[in-house]
Amino acid sequence: MDIKGFYSGNIFDAYKYLGAHVKENEVTFRTFAPNAKKIELIGEFNDWNGTEMIRSNDGNFFECSIENAKAGMLYKYKIYSKDGSYIDHCDPYGFGMELRPNTASIIRDLKEYTFNDSEWMKERSDCKDKPLNIYEVHLGSWKKKHDNTWYTYKELEELLIPYVK
């Protein structure tokens, strides 16, 4: 990863470096935490007992590889602050997350996902010279069903698009 580009905010594929990356015989985990004293990786693969992550030379990234980790397993980062306190945190670059109230990340093998939007990508308009409107919303807190359960993404699509337009 281009570290200078990351620090300047000019890199848009940090997900290729950060997060949990499945390899043939192991999973490599990386995260960015410049203010952490140390980080331990906890998950199903180590019975939720911490595996200390290695700090990068610049001190801002942490990394470790786990041989018995597999796609579908749950994990979190146990992040220690300078005062010794810690918090268990999901992976901000995780490719899968548990549904709340649970908060663990889920190891996903991106090679197992096949995009099927090639026709749409071919037909979409080139609108780089037109204004762009970005609407950011947290779907879980935007709207719930009357019985206090959450909508599916498909159901929210039908509600949110007309709302934003």
Residue ranges of predicted features:
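Short beta-strand elements bearing conserved aromatic residues within extracellular beta-rich modules
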Residues: I39-L41, Y75
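Glycine-rich, histidine-containing beta strand-loop boundary motifs that form or position
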Residues: T31, G43, I79
